[in-house]
Regions:
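Generic alpha-helical secondary-structure signal
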Residues: 12, 28, 169-172
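Glycine-rich anion/phosphate-binding loops
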Residues: 3-11
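Short, charged beta->alpha transition segments
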Residues: 12-20, 49, 76
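A short, structured active-site edge motif that brings together acidic residues
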Residues: 1-3, 27-31, 90
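Active-site groove signature of glycoside hydrolases
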Residues: 17-36, 40
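Beta/alpha (TIM)-barrel catalytic core signal, keyed to glycine-rich beta->alpha loops juxtaposed to Asp/Glu
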Residues: 33-190
Length: 190
Protein backbone atom coordinates (compact mmCIF):
# COMPACT_ATOMS: atom_id res chain seq x y z
CA UNK A 1 0.00 0.00 0.00
CA UNK A 2 1.05 3.58 -0.63
CA UNK A 3 1.77 5.11 2.76
CA UNK A 4 4.07 7.98 1.85
CA UNK A 5 2.69 11.48 1.68
CA UNK A 6 3.86 14.54 -0.21
CA UNK A 7 5.22 15.82 3.09
CA UNK A 8 7.27 12.69 3.81
CA UNK A 9 8.69 12.74 0.28
CA UNK A 10 9.75 16.37 0.68
CA UNK A 11 11.20 15.70 4.13
CA UNK A 12 13.22 12.74 2.84
CA UNK A 13 14.61 14.69 -0.09
CA UNK A 14 15.55 17.58 2.19
CA UNK A 15 17.19 15.19 4.67
CA UNK A 16 19.13 13.46 1.90
CA UNK A 17 20.38 16.78 0.57
CA UNK A 18 21.60 17.75 4.04
CA UNK A 19 23.20 14.36 4.64
CA UNK A 20 24.95 14.44 1.26
CA UNK A 21 25.80 18.15 1.62
CA UNK A 22 24.17 18.98 -1.69
CA UNK A 23 22.05 21.89 -2.80
CA UNK A 24 20.11 19.83 -5.34
CA UNK A 25 19.84 16.47 -7.09
CA UNK A 26 19.78 16.24 -10.86
CA UNK A 27 17.06 13.58 -11.06
CA UNK A 28 14.63 12.26 -8.49
CA UNK A 29 12.90 9.08 -9.60
CA UNK A 30 10.03 7.32 -7.98
CA UNK A 31 11.41 3.82 -8.42
CA UNK A 32 9.63 0.62 -9.45
CA UNK A 33 6.16 2.13 -9.58
CA UNK A 34 3.49 -0.50 -10.14
CA UNK A 35 0.58 0.31 -12.44
CA UNK A 36 -1.85 0.22 -9.50
CA UNK A 37 0.24 2.86 -7.67
CA UNK A 38 0.81 5.19 -10.58
CA UNK A 39 -2.08 7.59 -9.99
CA UNK A 40 -1.11 7.90 -6.32
CA UNK A 41 2.45 8.78 -7.28
CA UNK A 42 1.29 11.26 -9.92
CA UNK A 43 -1.49 12.92 -7.93
CA UNK A 44 -0.28 12.73 -4.32
CA UNK A 45 3.52 12.41 -4.28
CA UNK A 46 4.76 14.11 -7.45
CA UNK A 47 3.47 17.57 -6.48
CA UNK A 48 6.07 17.56 -3.69
CA UNK A 49 8.80 17.03 -6.26
CA UNK A 50 7.39 19.77 -8.46
CA UNK A 51 7.59 22.16 -5.48
CA UNK A 52 11.17 21.04 -4.78
CA UNK A 53 11.97 21.63 -8.44
CA UNK A 54 10.55 25.15 -8.21
CA UNK A 55 12.88 25.69 -5.22
CA UNK A 56 15.87 24.44 -7.25
CA UNK A 57 16.37 21.33 -5.12
CA UNK A 58 15.36 18.79 -7.78
CA UNK A 59 16.26 19.49 -11.39
CA UNK A 60 14.24 16.75 -13.09
CA UNK A 61 11.29 14.65 -11.95
CA UNK A 62 11.35 11.01 -12.99
CA UNK A 63 9.62 7.69 -12.67
CA UNK A 64 10.81 4.12 -13.19
CA UNK A 65 8.98 0.98 -14.05
CA UNK A 66 8.92 -2.40 -12.38
CA UNK A 67 9.40 -4.75 -15.30
CA UNK A 68 8.41 -7.99 -13.57
CA UNK A 69 5.14 -6.42 -12.39
CA UNK A 70 4.38 -4.55 -15.61
CA UNK A 71 5.88 -6.43 -18.56
CA UNK A 72 3.68 -4.57 -21.03
CA UNK A 73 4.93 -1.20 -19.69
CA UNK A 74 1.40 0.10 -19.20
CA UNK A 75 2.40 2.44 -16.39
CA UNK A 76 5.13 4.09 -18.44
CA UNK A 77 2.89 4.32 -21.51
CA UNK A 78 0.53 6.45 -19.42
CA UNK A 79 3.23 8.39 -17.56
CA UNK A 80 5.00 9.60 -20.69
CA UNK A 81 1.78 11.27 -21.81
CA UNK A 82 1.43 13.27 -18.58
CA UNK A 83 3.01 15.93 -16.42
CA UNK A 84 5.39 16.09 -14.50
CA UNK A 85 7.65 13.30 -15.78
CA UNK A 86 10.80 14.53 -17.51
CA UNK A 87 12.87 11.36 -17.35
CA UNK A 88 12.08 7.67 -17.10
CA UNK A 89 14.07 4.55 -16.33
CA UNK A 90 12.95 1.37 -18.03
CA UNK A 91 14.01 -2.15 -18.88
CA UNK A 92 15.13 -2.69 -22.46
CA UNK A 93 17.34 -5.30 -24.07
CA UNK A 94 17.87 -7.57 -27.04
CA UNK A 95 15.13 -9.80 -25.67
CA UNK A 96 12.86 -7.08 -24.29
CA UNK A 97 12.18 -4.65 -27.13
CA UNK A 98 8.65 -3.48 -26.38
CA UNK A 99 9.72 0.11 -25.72
CA UNK A 100 10.92 0.52 -29.30
CA UNK A 101 7.36 1.05 -30.49
CA UNK A 102 5.46 1.61 -27.25
CA UNK A 103 7.64 4.13 -25.39
CA UNK A 104 10.53 5.64 -27.37
CA UNK A 105 8.50 7.42 -30.08
CA UNK A 106 6.64 9.38 -27.40
CA UNK A 107 9.71 10.12 -25.26
CA UNK A 108 11.54 11.42 -28.33
CA UNK A 109 8.58 13.56 -29.40
CA UNK A 110 8.06 14.98 -25.89
CA UNK A 111 11.75 15.37 -24.97
CA UNK A 112 11.60 12.92 -22.06
CA UNK A 113 14.98 11.50 -21.08
CA UNK A 114 15.43 7.73 -21.01
CA UNK A 115 17.71 5.66 -18.82
CA UNK A 116 17.91 1.96 -19.64
CA UNK A 117 18.22 -0.68 -16.95
CA UNK A 118 18.36 -4.45 -17.29
CA UNK A 119 20.23 -4.24 -20.58
CA UNK A 120 22.32 -7.25 -19.58
CA UNK A 121 20.98 -9.98 -17.37
CA UNK A 122 21.99 -13.59 -16.82
CA UNK A 123 20.59 -14.54 -20.20
CA UNK A 124 23.46 -12.62 -21.82
CA UNK A 125 26.28 -13.08 -19.34
CA UNK A 126 25.82 -16.77 -18.44
CA UNK A 127 26.13 -19.17 -21.40
CA UNK A 128 24.76 -22.22 -19.54
CA UNK A 129 21.73 -20.28 -18.32
CA UNK A 130 21.19 -18.89 -21.82
CA UNK A 131 21.24 -22.36 -23.42
CA UNK A 132 18.89 -23.76 -20.76
CA UNK A 133 16.46 -20.86 -21.21
CA UNK A 134 16.38 -21.22 -24.99
CA UNK A 135 15.99 -25.02 -24.67
CA UNK A 136 12.97 -24.46 -22.42
CA UNK A 137 11.47 -22.06 -24.99
CA UNK A 138 11.98 -24.69 -27.71
CA UNK A 139 10.38 -27.33 -25.48
CA UNK A 140 7.37 -25.03 -24.94
CA UNK A 141 7.04 -24.57 -28.70
CA UNK A 142 7.83 -20.86 -28.51
CA UNK A 143 11.03 -21.16 -30.57
CA UNK A 144 12.11 -23.41 -33.41
CA UNK A 145 14.60 -26.12 -32.42
CA UNK A 146 17.06 -24.90 -35.07
CA UNK A 147 18.02 -22.05 -32.76
CA UNK A 148 19.95 -24.60 -30.68
CA UNK A 149 21.80 -26.20 -33.62
CA UNK A 150 24.91 -24.02 -33.47
CA UNK A 151 25.52 -24.33 -29.73
CA UNK A 152 25.00 -20.81 -28.43
CA UNK A 153 21.60 -19.51 -29.54
CA UNK A 154 22.96 -15.96 -29.58
CA UNK A 155 26.36 -16.87 -31.02
CA UNK A 156 25.55 -15.10 -34.27
CA UNK A 157 25.96 -11.81 -32.39
CA UNK A 158 29.71 -12.34 -32.13
CA UNK A 159 30.28 -14.47 -35.23
CA UNK A 160 31.14 -11.51 -37.45
CA UNK A 161 33.60 -10.17 -34.88
CA UNK A 162 31.73 -6.94 -34.20
CA UNK A 163 31.33 -7.67 -30.49
CA UNK A 164 33.76 -9.27 -28.06
CA UNK A 165 31.09 -11.41 -26.42
CA UNK A 166 27.34 -11.63 -25.93
CA UNK A 167 27.37 -9.10 -23.09
CA UNK A 168 29.24 -6.61 -25.29
CA UNK A 169 26.73 -7.21 -28.10
CA UNK A 170 23.81 -6.58 -25.73
CA UNK A 171 25.26 -3.26 -24.57
CA UNK A 172 26.07 -2.23 -28.15
CA UNK A 173 22.53 -3.04 -29.21
CA UNK A 174 21.03 -0.87 -26.48
CA UNK A 175 23.32 2.09 -26.98
CA UNK A 176 22.45 2.29 -30.68
CA UNK A 177 18.69 2.18 -30.20
CA UNK A 178 16.97 5.38 -31.30
CA UNK A 179 15.37 7.05 -28.30
CA UNK A 180 17.93 5.84 -25.76
CA UNK A 181 19.73 8.56 -23.83
CA UNK A 182 21.63 6.62 -21.13
CA UNK A 183 22.50 2.94 -20.81
CA UNK A 184 23.07 1.96 -17.19
CA UNK A 185 25.71 -0.69 -16.58
CA UNK A 186 25.19 -3.36 -13.96
CA UNK A 187 27.18 -3.74 -10.80
CA UNK A 188 27.97 -7.43 -11.22
CA UNK A 189 31.48 -8.70 -11.72
CA UNK A 190 30.83 -11.36 -14.36
Amino acid sequence: PDTDTAETVAERVEAALRRLRLDYVDIFHFHAVRPASYEYHRDVLAPALVRLKEQGKVRHVGITETGPNDPEQKMLAQAIQEHPWEVIMLAYSLLNQGARHGIFPTTMRRGIGTLLMSVVRNIFSNAAYRRATFAKLVEQGRLDASILSDGDPLGFLVAAGAAENITDAAYRYARHEQGVDVVLFGTGDK
